[in-house]
């Protein structure tokens, strides 16, 4: 067998059995999307419907120096670290996993410039269907895709836009900063 470091390898390593093990508590009971679907190109890594707050910033949302949420890369916080009276109200949120197609639900639109202008994310919605992106929009189904991945695109959200707003990234790399709304 393969040797792995303590706490496991990178979260995209599908040959690591614990990453493929679905934890039922990580899925909302109403989520009927397939868990592992090799035929449709979905990752064999287990999924989640729950995400963690990375604060209210687009740029550097995963960088502990810039993060204003409770969860940041290589950082540990406790409830006692919340001192402004309201910071512990947004700790976790629900994530819709990709529904496929151009639907806004669970999909992240790749829109150049969204790292500095969040209005571009909303502008990518179809004016005739506010629950879908306009035809031709490049889409990634990252939301909730790998429960073991700390990237905001997979298991996090920020409060740049209100809940149930679109999710957008400036780049096709799933580790890029972006507007990752809870949905």
List each language-model region with its residue ranges.
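Internal low-complexity, small-residue/proline-rich segments
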Residues: 1-183
């Amino acid at each position: 067998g393969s040797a792995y470091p303590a706490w496991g390898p990178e979260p995209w390593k599908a040959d690591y059995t614990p990453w493929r093990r679905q934890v039922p508590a990580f899925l909302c009971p109403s989520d009927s999307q397939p868990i592992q679907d090799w035929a449709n190109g979905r990752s064999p890594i287990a999924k989640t419907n729950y995400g963690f707050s990375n604060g209210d910033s687009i740029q550097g949302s995963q960088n502990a120096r810039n993060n204003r949420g409770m969860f940041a890369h290589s950082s540990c916080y406790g409830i006692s670290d919340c001192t402004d009276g309201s910071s512990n109200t947004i700790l976790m949120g629900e994530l819709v996993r990709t529904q496929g197609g151009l639907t806004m639900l669970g999909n992240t639109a790749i829109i150049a410039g969204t790292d500095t202008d969040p209005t571009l994310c909303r502008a990518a919605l179809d004016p005739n269907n506010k629950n879908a992106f306009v035809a031709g929009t490049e889409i990634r189904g990252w939301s909730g895709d790998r429960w073991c991945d700390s990237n905001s695109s997979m298991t996090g959200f920020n409060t740049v836009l209100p809940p149930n707003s679109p999710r957008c990234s400036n780049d096709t790399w799933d580790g890029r900063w972006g507007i990752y709304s809870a949905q």
